[in-house]
UniProtKB/Swiss-Prot annotation:
PROSITE patterns according to UniProt: SHMT (PS00096)
Biological-process GO terms, alphabetical: glycine biosynthetic process from serine; tetrahydrofolate interconversion
Record's keyword terms, sorted: Amino-acid biosynthesis, Cytoplasm, One-carbon metabolism, Pyridoxal phosphate, Transferase
The protein's role, per its UniProt record: Catalyzes the reversible interconversion of serine and glycine with tetrahydrofolate (THF) serving as the one-carbon carrier. This reaction serves as the major source of one-carbon groups required for the biosynthesis of purines, thymidylate, methionine, and other important biomolecules. Also exhibits THF-independent aldolase activity toward beta-hydroxyamino acids, producing glycine and aldehydes, via a retro-aldol mechanism.
Coiled coil regions in record: none
Top-level EC class: transferase
GO CC annotations on file: cytosol
Residue positions binding (6S)-5,6,7,8-tetrahydrofolate: L115, G119, H120, L121, S348, P349, F350
GO molecular function: glycine hydroxymethyltransferase activity; pyridoxal phosphate binding
Disulfide bridges in this chain: none
Protein's name in the database: Serine hydroxymethyltransferase
Length: 415
């Protein structure tokens, strides 16, 4: 139908589908949803308006919508052990915005992770609403090991006395010590909000410790390692439920995207299966296999010396390339990464000294450790031989052979 109604859009979708099939996707925030998740999101639920919450709607005809949203909520509660869950946020950024609005006043002091050290725009960037509406102070990693500097964070908290401490990251490869963060927050009487967007899938299966018992509020996206549709979610203690729900609706959103919420419910159901635990363990094993290869090279340096989760940062200082240059070179041989700042960055965010690499999407295709070691070696080969046409052609052919070997439609962890 789409091909007939709008052939231009249809053709572009087909081209994107072809790109995904024939590229090795290493962007840490991307994944490949199951056919069931995709089917739910493309359903007739997109036709339905449902302002409000289950059994408290401002529109009629929501009897099935209520059941679907309730299922999403209950599955998320089971998955993460949360008192209360709101599945309506359209994105992780909107989930974070709602938490700030629910618990803070404009101008309140917040302590968040420095973007350069691995934080997120919504954790206080001056270019983001968070840094414009609230008085953010930053903490980061230690210069000795590039891991979170909890002592420095605690000292900063004592100095600033923030009303909230925000933790979680978009480019941090190590396990986060949530009990320590709770202790620091309690010492200054601050709320503790954890943004677990990147590690939610790992948390769901116990591969990464859970922030839920320690945080007042936890926000997340529902894609990335959780392998659901693009969207957001908030988990909180029961005492904050009313404030959080009111901040989402009518605070910052109107009608929820019920077709996306249905897809979230499906993804949560998938994450409750034993196969998903095996999948998340493989994500980490694959990332560690890649990091081990990079760690043996003189061309790159693995930030913090390794990874405990799904991603790693590579310092390209010794390679003669910046992040943007390597991103473009890898694109030319069908490997997708993103340029990324590294701790104590010296280049602009439009160039960067590093790249970020993640394994969720390739693990969804069925890649194992040996395959990931091969990918790492291909990346090193691009760095070393990027000015040799014959070598780059051979690398491109090797990548296409791998993507043919692990087609998306036959991915091990998909239906």
């Amino acid at each position: 139908m789409l091909a007939k109604t709008d052939p231009v859009i249809n053709d572009l979708i087909k081209q994107e589908e072809n790109r995904q099939r024939h590229n090795i996707e290493l962007i840490a925030s991307e994944n490949i949803v199951s056919g069931a998740v995709q089917e739910a999101q493309g359903s007739v639920l997109t036709n339905k308006y449902a302002e409000g919450y289950p059994n408290k709607r401002f529109y009629g005809g929501c009897e099935y919508i209520d059941q679907i949203e309730t299922l999403a909520i209950e599955r998320a509660k089971e998955l993460f052990g949360a008192d209360h869950v709101n599945v309506q946020p359209h994105s992780g950024s909107q989930a974070n915005m709602a938490v700030y609005q629910a618990l803070l006043e404009p101008g309140d002091k917040i302590l968040g992770m420095n973007l350069t050290d691995g934080g997120h725009l919504t954790h206080g960037s001056p270019f983001n609403f968070s840094g414009q509406l609230y008085d953010f102070y930053s903490y980061g990693v230690a210069d000795t090991n590039e891991q979170l500097d909890y002592a420095s964070l605690a000292a900063k908290a004592q100095e600033v006395h923030p009303k909230m401490i925000v933790a979680g990251a978009s480019a941090y490869s190590r396990t986060i010590d949530f009990p320590r963060l709770r202790e620091i927050a309690d010492q200054v009487g601050a709320y503790l909000m954890i943004d677990m967007a990147h590690i939610a899938g790992l948390v769901a299966t116990g591969v990464h410790p859970s922030p839920v018992p320690y945080a007042d509020v936890v926000t997340t996206t529902t894609h990335k390692t959780l392998r659901g549709p693009r969207g957001g979610m908030i988990l909180c203690k029961a005492e904050y439920a009313k404030a959080i729900d009111s901040a989402i609706f009518p605070g910052i959103q109107g009608g929820p995207l019920e077709h996306v919420i249905a897809a979230k419910a499906v993804a949560f159901g998938e994450a409750l299966q034993p196969e998903f635990t095996a999948y998340t363990k493989q994500i980490v094993a694959n990332a560690q296999a890649m990091a081990a290869v990079f760690d043996q090279s003189d061309l790159v340096r693995v930030v913090s010396g390794g990874t405990d989760n799904h991603l790693m940062l590579l310092d390209l200082t010794n390679s003669g390339l910046n992040g943007k240059e390597l991103q473009n070179l890898l694109d030319s041989v069908h490997i997708t990464v993103n340029k990324n700042t590294i701790p104590f960055e010296k280049l602009s965010p439009f160039k960067t000294s590093g790249i970020r690499i993640g394994t969720p999407a390739i693990t969804s295709r069925g890649f194992k450790e040996k395959d990931c070691e091969q990918i790492a070696n291909l990346i090193l080969e691009v760095i070393e031989k990027h000015d040799q046409l014959e070598a780059m052609t051979a690398i491109s052919e090797a990548v296409l052979k791998l993507t043919d070997q692990f087609p998306i439609t036959q991915a091990k962890f998909l239906d």
